[in-house]
Amino acid sequence: MTTLSDYVDFSQDSFKYAALSIAFNPIFWNVVARAEYRSHFLTRIFGSPYRGCYFLAITIFSLGILRDHIYQQALEDQPYYAPVHQPVLGGALFAVGSVLVLSSMYALGVTGTYLGDYFGILMDAPVTGFPFNVTGSPMYWGSTLNFLGVALYKGKVAGILLTALVFVLYWFALKWEDPFTAEIYAKRERERAKSKRGGKNQ
């Protein structure tokens, strides 16, 4: 009887490291961002919310590069399975994912992409143009498509399994992040409304 272990070598350390790095990154940036929001520790260390945000951006970007390298290495160590070797589809998914990620970064800028709102660096208005008119979370879903695209391009079931882990973690991250971010902006609007009322009463 065929089992998943026939297509995925769970004994490979590289597979375990890939899973750990995939799990670590969103947990790390959410924990650090919330700590910054509550205590402003990065702002105090670097003397400015912008410098603190740039430091976090470089850290998150570097961790992402490391995660991608570990993922690529993990796939090299995994069995090849011909039915999931779909290089054309994999390349197309990777291209679409890259467009979503890069256009999102362009639309949001550094501080918008890398949790600037937790530093008090808020955007004047939500971005509603491309790619946000396609999906509300283009960075996350674009990245997920990149993982899947690489897995299909290389014909590795392990890559599909790790992509599922990416999807689950990003889904939970959004459930955690979206309400918190919405409250940050709602708080700003309440403060603006209060300030306007105070100005009228003077």
Curated annotation (Swiss-Prot):
Principal subcellular localization: endoplasmic reticulum
UniProt entry keywords in alphabetical sequence: Endoplasmic reticulum, Lipid biosynthesis, Lipid metabolism, Membrane, Methyltransferase, Mitochondrion, Phospholipid biosynthesis, Phospholipid metabolism, S-adenosyl-L-methionine, Transferase, Transmembrane, Transmembrane helix
Statement: the UniProt record of this protein carries the keyword Cell inner membrane: no
Residues in compartment: Lumenal: 1-12, 34-45, 112-154
Bilayer topology: Multi-pass membrane protein
Gene Ontology cellular-component annotations: endoplasmic reticulum membrane; mitochondrial membrane
Protein's name in the database: Phosphatidyl-N-methylethanolamine N-methyltransferase
